[in-house]
Design a protein with these regions (language model features):
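Structured, active/binding-site neighborhoods that engage oxygen-rich ligands
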Residues: 22-235
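Sec-dependent N-terminal signal peptides
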Residues: 5-14
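C-terminal motif of bacterial Sec signal peptides marking the signal peptidase cleavage site
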Residues: 16-19
C-alpha cells in the first residue's frame, strides 16, 4: 500500500512541478520565483517526508504529555533502540493517528483524484477502524450523526475545534504540493475544517506550508519564516 501511495505521489508531484513555475510565490530575497527539481530528488524528498514523520511520531511517543509547557532538556535520555518503530506499530498501533489520518486522506486522493469532494475524506476516516481522540474523534461522531464538514469541525459542534489534530496530520498537504504553499493551504482549507477551526486549523495550515517550502529551500529559518505568511500574524 505504501509503495502504491508513494508512486501516486511521485507521479502527481512530477506533474505538479510542471506547473510549479506558474505559481507565483510571494517575492522575497530568500525564495526563487521559479524552481526546477529532478524527479529523482523530488521522490527522495517525498520519501524523506514520510520517513521523517514516521520516525518522529515513534521517537516522541515516550515523551507525550510528560513535558507540558516546557522544553525537553538535552540531559533527558530518550530511548530509541533498533527496531523500536516496528515494536511501537506492532504493540501500540493506536498511538499513531498522525500517520493513519494522513494516509487515509492520500488514499482518497489516489482513488478519486485531486478534486475529490470533502465528504469523501470525511466518510473515509469516520468509518475507519482505528481509534481517534479529541477533535478527530468529535468530528467522527459528528459525521456519523449527520453533521458534515465544515460544520463537523466548527466550535459550535466540536468542543475540541482548537486542538492540534489537523496540525499533526497536515503533512500530506505539503508533501503533495511541492513549492506551492498556497495550494497546500487550499487543501487544508477543505480537509482541515473537517475537524478543526481557528488556531486548531491554522497550525495545520502552517505545517503544510512548511512541508511545501522544504522542497525548494534547505534553510530551516527560511522555511519557518516564509510559512508564517500563510496564517494570520496573531494566530
Amino acid at each position: 500500500m505504501m509503495n502504491k501511495i508513494l508512486l501516486f505521489l511521485a507521479i502527481g508531484f512530477a506533474t505538479g512541478m510542471l506547473s510549479c513555475s506558474q505559481q507565483t510565490l510571494e517575492k522575497t530575497d530568500s525564495l526563487p520565483q521559479t524552481y526546477t527539481i529532478s524527479q529523482e530528488r523530488l521522490l527522495d524528498k517525498i520519501k524523506g517526508g514520510w520517513a521523517g514523520q514516521t520516525i518522529g511520531v515513534a521517537y516522541g511517543g515516550p515523551t507525550e504529555f510528560r513535558y507540558r509547557s516546557a522544553m525537553i532538556q538535552d540531559y533527558v535520555p530518550i530511548s530509541y533502540a533498533d527496531g523500536c518503530i516496528k515494536n511501537y506499530f506492532k504493540h501500540a498501533p493506536g498511538l499513531f493517528d498522525d500517520i493513519y489520518m494522513d494516509l487515509t486522506f492520500v488514499e482518497v486522493f489516489d482513488r478519486l483524484g485531486i478534486d475529490a469532494p470533502v465528504d469523501s475524506f470525511a466518510h473515509a476516516f469516520a468509518h475507519a477502524d482505528y481509534g481517534l481522540w479529541h477533535a478527530n474523534q468529535a468530528a467522527r461522531y459528528n459525521i456519523l450523526n449527520g453533521i458534515m464538514p465544515p460544520a463537523s469541525g466548527h466550535w459550535l459542534n466540536n468542543p475540541h475545534a482548537d486542538d492540534i489534530d489537523y496540525q499533526i496530520e497536515a503533512d500530506f498537504a505539503g508533501l503533495m504540493t511541492p513549492g506551492m504553499p498556497n495550494t497546500a493551504s487550499e487543501i487544508s482549507d477543505k480537509i482541515g475544517h473537517i475537524m478543526n477551526y481557528g488556531d486548531g486549523w491554522y497550525g495545520g495550515v502552517y505545517i503544510g506550508a512548511m512541508y511545501s517550502l522544504a522542497f525548494i529551500s534547505d534553510d530551516i529559518n527560511i522555511v519557518v519564516q516564509e510559512a508564517l505568511k500563510t496564517i494570520p500574524e496573531n494566530s
